[in-house]
Amino acid sequence: MKKGLFIVVDSGEGSGKTLQLNKAKEFFGKDLVLTREPGGSPYAEEIRNLILKSANAHQADAKTMFGLFWAARADHLKNTIVPALKAGKVVISDRFDSSTFAYQIVAQGARELETFFWQMRDFYLKDLKPDLYIYFDIDPVIGLARKNNQGGGELNHFEARQIDFHNQLREGYKEFMAHVPHEVIDASQPIEKVWGDFKKVLEKSLSKK
């Protein structure tokens, strides 16, 4: 089914990923569809608010979050990603199933869901699995310091967790990436150097489209 190109960009907190994605959108223009998770479609954005902004979200365990993320992802796929790919667009998602694995399976410690995760991935994605994952790697100490220095309001309940959580998160991403086509970018570099590396990876991927 897939006519376009599907790329996921993911990272822990404070990598500068969102800034780099905005630069990509500006550089590559209208043929690039930039979306995000959780969210990316009207109903999935409502689930995003439930996941990140609900007053009681911090009380939800990994199993609850796991279900909510996959529900949002199903709607996101149907209403945003699939139509764009059918139209031959390049879709870049700011987070995707890689985050579910890193956050819920590893950092939140729900290893009992690991086999189920891969089953869910096969069931929901089928032939829609991303062509490439780009992981912005950064030491959590540096990333969290950046996040705190940026200001921009209160941290969500994931961002506000202790450093051990974020160290586990980094390990979770590395573990997931071993299973999929991926590129790693050193996000601790200066912004323009990160952009140069990111642009090079995107141009290489687009040349194969």
What kind of region is each of these model predictions?
Residues 32-125:
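ATP-dependent small-molecule kinase phosphotransfer cores
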Residues 18:
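Walker A/P-loop
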Residues 25, 141-209:
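NTP-dependent small-molecule kinase module
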Residues 7-9:
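Hydrophobic anchor at the beta1->P-loop junction of P-loop NTPases
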Residues 1-5:
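Extreme N-terminal, non-catalytic leader segments
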Residues 98-171:
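A glycine- and Lys/Arg-enriched "phosphate-lid" helix/loop adjacent to the NTP-binding pocket
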Residues 14-15:
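ATP-binding Walker
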